UniProtKB/Swiss-Prot annotation:
This is UPF0102 protein PG_1874. PANTHER family: UPF0102 PROTEIN YRAN. Belongs to the UPF0102 family. It comes from the Bacteria. One of its GO terms (molecular function) is nucleic acid binding. Transmembrane segments: none annotated. SUPFAM superfamilies: Restriction endonuclease-like. InterPro entries: Restrct_endonuc-II-like, tRNA_endonuc-like_dom_sf, UPF0102_YraN-like. Pfam families: UPF0102 (PF02021). Gene3D superfamilies: 3.40.1350.10.
Length: 135
């Protein structure tokens, strides 16, 4: 398996441990439906938390969280929308990003959990209520 896949899996394990220590309930890991995928789906008593995990090795030019661009945020939003509809979840959804930086030996150098990293982004056709047009 490619090093980046191993690194990604290691970052997800570190993120899972962090979330559990913070009291989150893990609902799904690497949830997939068609081409849709969510790294981690967790929950609190008040909300569903969709977590995108980005892992890099120390010295990588791009910070992990910078890899979650507008296109990626939209895909995550669409996947979360599908997850919520599929399981009839009636909780607000929050999108977090966990950035993991590994040292050369593979140990965790830094972990950063950014809550409310971005809002729900959907295409108009996926919105449950149409927007009103101004006259």
């Amino acid at each position: 398996m490619a090093d980046h896949n191993d690194r990604g899996r290691q970052g997800e394990e570190i993120a899972l441990k962090h979330l559990r220590q913070q009291g989150y309930q893990i609902e799904a890991l690497n949830w997939q439906s068609g081409r849709r995928e969510l790294d981690i789906v967790a929950s609190t008593s008040r909300e569903l938390v969709v977590v995108e995990v980005k892992t890099r090795t120390e010295g990588f030019l791009l910070a992990p969280e910078e890899a979650v661009d507008a296109r990626k945020r939209r895909l995550i939003s669409e996947s979360a929308h599908h997850y919520v509809r599929m399981y009839a979840i009636d909780l607000p959804v929050r999108f977090d990003v966990i950035s993991v930086v590994l040292s050369a030996d593979g140990s965790c150098k830094r972990i950063e959990h950014r809550e409310n990293a971005f809002p729900l982004l959907l295409k108009r056709s996926q919105r449950s209520t149409p927007r009103r047009r101004r006259l």
